[in-house]
Amino acid sequence: MDRNEIFEKIMRLEMNVNQLSKETSELKALAVELVEENVALQLENDNLKKVLGNDEPTTIDTANSKPAKAVKKPLPSKDNLAILYGEGFHICKGELFGKHRHGEDCLFCLEVLSD
């Protein structure tokens, strides 16, 4: 193998690495977008459940009703964390908590919101 062949292989490898890096960045952006949308929809769903839970008439047939399962109420702290994240602060566990994100998305913060 001469120098030109080696150089061409290195150039092709560099182009492949650049393409993979670009695709990885696109996938990361898509994942962040999907997680943010999921968190927003979960919060909206929880709020709608609260509203519907308060407005629904309480007509329960006790003879045919099954024991109710324990309903997990959303914590208001999660709403507060979502607000902080929306204002640009880290909410993930560790030393980044409370520091400004400078407009960048953090997958760890989004994971905290999705739990």
Curated annotation (Swiss-Prot):
GO biological process: DNA replication
Keywords (A to Z) from UniProt: Cytoplasm, DNA replication, DNA replication inhibitor, Metal-binding, Zinc
Keyword Cytoplasm part of the UniProt annotation: yes
Segment forming the signal sequence: none
Subcellular location(s) of the protein: Cytoplasm, Nucleoid
Cellular component GO terms, alphabetical: nucleoid
InterPro entries per the UniProt record, alphabetical: YabA
Entry cofactors: Zn(2+)
Binding site for Zn(2+): H90, C92, C106, C109
Disulfide links within the chain: none
Cofactor: how bound: Binds 1 zinc ion per subunit.
Function in brief: Involved in control of chromosome replication initiation. Inhibits the cooperative binding of DnaA to the oriC region, thus negatively regulating initiation of chromosome replication. Inhibits the ability of DnaA-ATP to form a helix on DNA; does not disassemble preformed DnaA-DNA helices. Decreases the residence time of DnaA on the chromosome at its binding sites (oriC, replication forks and promoter-binding sites). Tethers DnaA to the replication machinery via the DNA polymerase beta sliding clamp subunit (dnaN).
Membership in a protein family: Belongs to the YabA family.
Assembly and interaction partners: Homotetramer. Interacts with both DnaA and DnaN, acting as a bridge between these two proteins.
Protein name, entry field: Replication initiation control protein YabA
